[in-house]
Curated annotation (Swiss-Prot):
<dbReference type="GO" id="GO:0004518">
    <property type="term" value="F:nuclease activity"/>
</dbReference>
<dbReference type="GO" id="GO:0000967">
    <property type="term" value="P:rRNA 5'-end processing"/>
</dbReference>
<dbReference type="InterPro" id="IPR006641">
    <property type="entry name" value="YqgF/RNaseH-like_dom"/>
</dbReference>
<keyword id="KW-0540">Nuclease</keyword>
<comment type="function">
    <text>Could be a nuclease involved in processing of the 5'-end of pre-16S rRNA.</text>
</comment>
<dbReference type="InterPro" id="IPR037027">
    <property type="entry name" value="YqgF/RNaseH-like_dom_sf"/>
</dbReference>
<comment type="similarity">
    <text>Belongs to the YqgF nuclease family.</text>
</comment>
<keyword id="KW-0690">Ribosome biogenesis</keyword>
<protein>
    <recommendedName>
        <fullName>Putative pre-16S rRNA nuclease</fullName>
        <ecNumber>3.1.-.-</ecNumber>
    </recommendedName>
</protein>
<dbReference type="GO" id="GO:0005829">
    <property type="term" value="C:cytosol"/>
</dbReference>
<dbReference type="InterPro" id="IPR012337">
    <property type="entry name" value="RNaseH-like_sf"/>
</dbReference>
<keyword id="KW-0378">Hydrolase</keyword>
<dbReference type="Pfam" id="PF03652">
    <property type="entry name" value="RuvX"/>
</dbReference>
<dbReference type="InterPro" id="IPR005227">
    <property type="entry name" value="YqgF"/>
</dbReference>
<keyword id="KW-0963">Cytoplasm</keyword>
Length: 143
């Protein structure tokens, strides 16, 4: 069962895909979006759903450190509702506190990407990988 992991931001959506067995997550791409123009990248997501035979989505919920929800959580939930309407596939949510910070640390310390411009190109994808991998591990433990 393949899942798409999505890190939804105000200007981009980082995308990751699970392997067919649902064990690991790999980065795919970053999709540019523009809320003011109602451009949410659904055409590109449709291509990915078809290409990889996706059976569901995992979106990060960027809660505040105290566990409360802010505007970013609402944006992710609205995006999830849009996905449900367009694709009629299940949408799961995963707490994503600090995934972007963690992704940045991994890119610098483990991948040796010190240039901020280069990190910015892939940080959303890396955050999507962390969100999806966390979900895959959590659901595997539940089985």
């Amino acid at each position: 069962m393949r899942l798409l992991g999505l890190d939804v931001g105000s200007k981009t959506v980082g995308v990751a895909i699970s392997d067919p067995l649902g064990i690991t997550a790999q980065e795919l791409e970053t999709i540019k979006i523009d809320e003011s123009k109602f451009s949410f990248g659904m055409r590109q997501i449709r291509k990915l759903v078809r290409k990889y035979d996706v059976e569901g989505f995992v979106l990060g919920l960027p809660k505040n450190m105290d566990g409360s929800s802010g505007h970013s959580v609402e944006r992710s939930k609205q995006y999830g509702e849009r996905l449900k309407e367009k694709f009629d596939l299940p949408v799961h949510y995963m707490d994503e506190r600090l995934t972007t910070v963690q992704a940045d640390r991994i890119l610098v310390q483990e991948a040796g990407v010190h240039d901020r411009v280069e990190r910015k190109k892939v940080i959303d994808q890396m955050a999507a990988v962390l969100i999806l991998q966390s979900y895959l591990e959590a659901t595997r433990k539940d089985k």
